[in-house]
């Protein structure tokens, strides 16, 4: 890894520590997904992830899971912006890879599902054949994959094309003017932390982990599974997200709407479950990648 990239990681980590609880959804949500995933890593995965992480991460994947958001506005990384989401036709409430996975210039496979397949393939090629390692930056591949599996579980990262996943829908979150996408990226989690967890992200993560071993325990094997022995299966995750976007995110959230307790209390369980699902599925994907068992990336 280059010295400049190491310096960037160090700077991001220091800022993360200084902010101390006032983090945006990108950091809070992605940290939560990756922290949950770490609890489900198999032994081979723990070793592989620690080997690939930058030294500044100190063996903690969660500490660098927001890196793709930190870099995407820098000119040399702008090409990654379309990889964080996939837009679908307005009001169809469904997702199709061949129809939807492209950037604004119609370059196919440039969307969040395509990115998950791509970075899965990169990590698999290295784990299966050491001769290919020189072709990919595996540290970046790990961080991109971990981040994008988080992104695809946010319903409005698989939203409508016409409103850019809710970014152009202006609403009020209680008294604060914002947009619908930001509500789901940030405001729901922020309000939950203040209302239920004394502004403590570790307490929220602990509560989600408790649900995974209790109320959701029967669902975990289903969340972990991929059809057809695939290593990565983001297409069903995208379909889930657009369905949830239509049923919960867009409903009763037209432009100019004030969203308050009714919206918050009915949508928070959706956000919490998507964070948990993202963590379980990230762990399952990385476990399949780094397992010695035969596998394939899928498509």
From Swiss-Prot:
Keyword annotations from UniProtKB, A to Z: Calcium, Disulfide bond, Endonuclease, Glycoprotein, Hydrolase, Manganese, Metal-binding, Nuclease, Signal
A single GO BP: DNA catabolic process
Annotated signal peptide: 1-24
Catalytic class of the enzyme: hydrolase
Cofactor: Mn(2+); Ca(2+)
Any Pfam family: S1-P1_nuclease
Binding-site residues for a divalent metal cation 2, renumbered to this chain: 157, 181, 185
Domain of life: Eukaryota
Any one GO MF annotation of this record: nucleic acid binding
Binding-site residues for a divalent metal cation 3, renumbered to this chain: 25, 30, 151
InterPro entries xrefs: PLipase_C/P1_nuclease_dom_sf, S1/P1nuclease
pH-activity dependence text: Optimum pH is 8 with RNA and ssDNA as substrates.
Residues binding a divalent metal cation 1: 69, 84, 147, 151
UniProt: substrate binding residues: 25-30, 69-75, 84-87, 94-99, 118, 136
Subunit structure, as described in the record: Monomer.
Database matches in PANTHER family: ENDONUCLEASE 4
Family classification: Belongs to the nuclease type I family.
Name of protein: Endonuclease 4
Organism: Arabidopsis thaliana
Lineage: Eukaryota, Viridiplantae, Streptophyta, Embryophyta, Tracheophyta
């Amino acid at each position: 890894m280059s010295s400049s990239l190491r310096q960037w990681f160090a700077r991001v980590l220091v800022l993360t520590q200084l902010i101390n609880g006032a983090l945006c959804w990108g950091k809070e949500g992605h940290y939560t997904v990756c922290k949950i995933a770490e609890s489900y890593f198999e032994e081979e995965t723990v070793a592989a992830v620690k080997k690939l992480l930058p030294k500044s991460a100190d063996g903690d994947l969660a500490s660098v899971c927001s890196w793709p958001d930190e870099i995407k506005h820098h000119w040399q990384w702008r090409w990654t912006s379309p990889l964080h989401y996939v837009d679908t036709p307005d009001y169809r409430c469904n997702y199709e890879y061949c129809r939807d996975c492209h950037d604004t210039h119609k370059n196919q496979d440039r969307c969040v599902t395509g990115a998950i397949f791509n970075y899965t393939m990169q990590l698999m090629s290295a784990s299966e054949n050491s001769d290919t390692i020189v072709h990919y930056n595996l540290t970046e591949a790990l961080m991109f994959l971990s981040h994008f599996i988080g992104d695809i579980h946010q319903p409005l990262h698989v939203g409508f094309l016409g409103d850019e996943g809710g970014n152009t829908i202006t609403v009020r979150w209680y008294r604060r003017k914002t947009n619908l996408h930001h509500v789901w990226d940030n405001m729901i989690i922020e309000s939950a932390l203040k209302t239920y967890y004394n502004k403590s992200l570790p307490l929220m993560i602990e509560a989600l982990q408790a649900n995974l071993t209790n109320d959701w325990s029967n669902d975990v094997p289903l969340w972990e599974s991929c059809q057809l022995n695939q290593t990565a299966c983001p297409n069903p995750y995208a379909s889930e997200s657009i369905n949830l976007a239509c049923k919960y995110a867009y409903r009763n959230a037209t432009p100019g709407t004030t969203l308050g307790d009714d919206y918050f209390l009915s949508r928070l369980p959706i956000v919490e479950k998507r964070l948990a699902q993202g963590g379980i599925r990230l762990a399952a994907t990385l476990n399949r990648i780094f397992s010695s068992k035969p596998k394939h990336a899928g498509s």
